[in-house]
Amino acid sequence: RHGFPDTLCPGVNKAIDKGIKVVIYDVEIQKCAQRAVQTQQSDAKMASLVLDQMLKDVGTGKPVGYVNVLGIAPLDRRDAVWKDYIAKNQWTQKFMTGKYTPSTATDTAPMVDNALKSNADVVAIYAPYDELTKATLSALGTNPNLKGKVKVYGADISTADIELMSAPDSPWVATGATDPNAIGAAVVRTLALHMAGTVKEGAKEDFPPILVTSEMLRSKNIKNMDDLRKNAPELNISKVSSADWIPAVTF
């Protein structure tokens, strides 16, 4: 799980004091470990891509639902964008629910089910983590009266997510996505650049996401991550945190 500053910062600072180069990913420790190099998905971009699609699909001034868990760095960053879109587009947030556990999808589904039963007028739900998106799909499945009436907007991508999105009549219509393999390679490249002195202490690197829609998956017959990589080569982000002396890696 994502670490917290009070547990991470002492060790990170101790390592840096000893001359060890430290690159962190997707944790918020800049305030207490300012010399570490920060890397992360561009969560603001990930959220805005999806919420722009939601706006296009449902319009302004609509009742919507929200499934998220605060206190986790990337979800907090996506939450900030959500709040901005709520205000700008006059959406009425009818509920916010969600729970982060070892079984997030299973444990959150009943909470979303209860929220839907009390707010059956929502036309869209934003669930910016794929386990929360899965919980939302499960809850909608137990409310057949809402079939075809609620669109779901998520985050992340995997072969399992692709199967859910491309299923017939799936309410999951869009997600913001990066390739975990490509992200891992980019973090390693960032470390190499930091060790070489090109990336300085305290630097920050954001890795850009793309928008994936269910329409795209179906029209291009994308069944898994390999298919998606072939159809969306920009997922590879091979030019991010790169140099001519670092071998290019593709997936």
Show which residues each predicted segment covers.
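Structural recognition of the beta-strand scaffold that forms the well-ordered cores
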Residues: 1, 21-26, 38-40, 62-68, ...
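Hydrophobic alpha-helical
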Residues: 1-17, 82, 101-164
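Flexible loop/hinge segments that line or gate small-molecule binding clefts
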Residues: 10-45, 63, 159-167
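Structured segments of extracytoplasmic/periplasmic soluble domains
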Residues: 11-18, 25, 53-61, 85-89, ...
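Hydrophobic alpha-helical segments within soluble ligand-binding/sensing domains
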Residues: 38-64, 77, 105-109, 157-162, ...
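An alpha-beta-alpha
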Residues: 48-98, 191, 199-222
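Extracellular/periplasmic periplasmic-binding protein-like sensory domains
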Residues: 76, 85-99, 124-129, 140-195
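Hinge/cleft segment of the Venus flytrap/periplasmic-binding protein
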Residues: 179, 187-251
